[in-house]
Amino acid sequence: VILFNVKEPEQQEKEPEEIQAEVMQNPETMTQTAENIEDKYKVFDTMSEDWGSDDLEGFVFYDLPEQYADKGYFPEKMQIYTRCLCKQNDVPYALVLAIIEYESGYEFDKTGDNGNSKGYMQIYEKWHTDRMQKLNCIDLMNPYQNVKVGIDFLSYLLKKYGTVQDALAAYNYGERGAREHLWNNGVYVYSYNTAIMQRMKEIEEVVGK
């Protein structure tokens, strides 16, 4: 028996306007889309706003740069929480914002390095299991836990190496990697830490130090 494959007629690719029109004509599709978007951001409701007036003193809401506004999301509650952690850990708030911008473009659910680097600060989970356990952070895709781990790591690096540029190199390469690939070769300033330090200065003009 010879079986013949019957080729279906090729469907023409629909124009964006046609797709939008179909969605507008289907209220159920619109509802499902809205629900999916709402579910995605529910994680931001998992943190209580238990900060006081002292924590809010000097706070300036940071509007995301236009190029990150579509995919990025960094709501006021997240900004206040991040700023509070920075103050507690003696880490420059503008530095953390610059790292988040560079690493994830303010996409809290972003993954990189084949899924190993996660969240706002692109934490590579394999190298931070002890830190996560210490901080009781088990989910790096939770934005609050992600920045808590990242800021704690930054605090450690800043205290150990003394400068933002070296702390950033160790954040980027890992301490051993920075030593072997950069410092042992006399390299201390390179594209990664240069870009972030420049953005940190620019962001400081908006949110302060």
Predicted features and spans:
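Catalytic glycan-binding domains that act on GlcNAc-containing polysaccharides
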Residues: 47-209
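N-terminal export signals and maturation junctions of secreted/periplasmic proteins
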Residues: 3-81
